[in-house]
Amino acid sequence: MTDSNNWYIEHFERTGSAIGYRITGKLDEVQSPFQKIEIFQTTDWGNLMTIDGAIMLTSKDNFFYHEMISHPVLFTHAAPKRVVIIGGGDCGTLREVLKHTGVESVTQCDIDEQVTVMARKHFPELCDSNDDARAELLFDDGVAYMANCPAGSVDVVIVDSTDPVGPGEGLFNKAFYESCFKALKDDGILVQQSESPLMQLELINEMRAEMGKAGFGSFKTLPFPQPCYPTGWWSVTMARKGDSSFDFRQADSAAKTFNTLYYTAALHTGVLVTPPFVQAALK
């Protein structure tokens, strides 16, 4: 919501907190069949996208999220070639994935085309790779897409979803994870945004439990800063089949030829160390 002093403020009842940005005006607004998308201009954080009133991203800090949901999982897999992104309509994750030259194809399936339309207009830097020949952009139900995905056809599934409410609700349960498990090859990896490790460890445990019921046997939750989200600290959770390691291709990561603003091989090594309070709470 905006107040009379030109601040956009989002209140988080579940964490008893709020985040605010000083804005200079609203740039755009669209009501899609699924949700209301708004774009604001801020004084210090570039453009701000909200969906149904919830802050999704800013120009200033989205790189934390997009890099951490993409590069750790891709350097953990031995040789990722076929990638599926569920959600991700702002296309920042797609851009990061396509920095990996070994990736041969990426299918992005987001239910709401208007998110991508708005990203192209107001966050064009995130859409640099939309026309890459390796990219396929679909606007459809991600749950149905994964249910119909051929068995053993995918190396990495990235679930770049909103919170587990509204259109994103069906992406956090056993049935969806079973579809991901089936679509992944034996050495495949699932990664999903998993909310704040400071305030939502219960949700992370619920996610891991549902993934386990679907057949996944190994999990790793990676925390990272994300200033525009509740608590300013976010996470992604990786899941693998069987008793698998989350060691990564450290030499390849260190020798990467593409630019990142946050992710490095050294940082990847550090983020694998789970903070004691998180480790104590995870089941």
Swiss-Prot record:
GO terms for molecular function: spermidine synthase activity. It is an enzyme of class 2 (transferase). Its main location: cytoplasm. The gene is speE. GO terms for biological process: spermidine biosynthetic process. Belongs to the spermidine/spermine synthase family. Homodimer or homotetramer. Keywords: Cytoplasm, Polyamine biosynthesis, Spermidine biosynthesis, Transferase. It is found in: Cytoplasm. This is Polyamine aminopropyltransferase. GO terms for cellular component: cytosol. It catalyses: S-adenosyl 3-(methylsulfanyl)propylamine + putrescine = S-methyl-5'-thioadenosine + spermidine + H(+). The keyword tRNA processing does not apply. The lineage of its organism: Bacteria, Pseudomonadati, Pseudomonadota, Gammaproteobacteria, Lysobacterales. Its EC number is 2.5.1.16. Spermidine binds at residues 66, 90, 160-163. InterPro entries: PABS, PABS_CS, SAM-dependent_MTases_sf, Spermi_synthase, Spermidine_synt_N, Spermidine_synt_N_sf. S-methyl-5'-thioadenosine binds at residues 35, 110, 141-142, 167. Catalyzes the irreversible transfer of a propylamine group from the amino donor S-adenosylmethioninamine (decarboxy-AdoMet) to putrescine (1,4-diaminobutane) to yield spermidine. The keyword Transmembrane does not apply. Residues 5-241 form the PABS domain. The active site is at residue 160. Pathway: Amine and polyamine biosynthesis; spermidine biosynthesis; spermidine from putrescine: step 1/1.
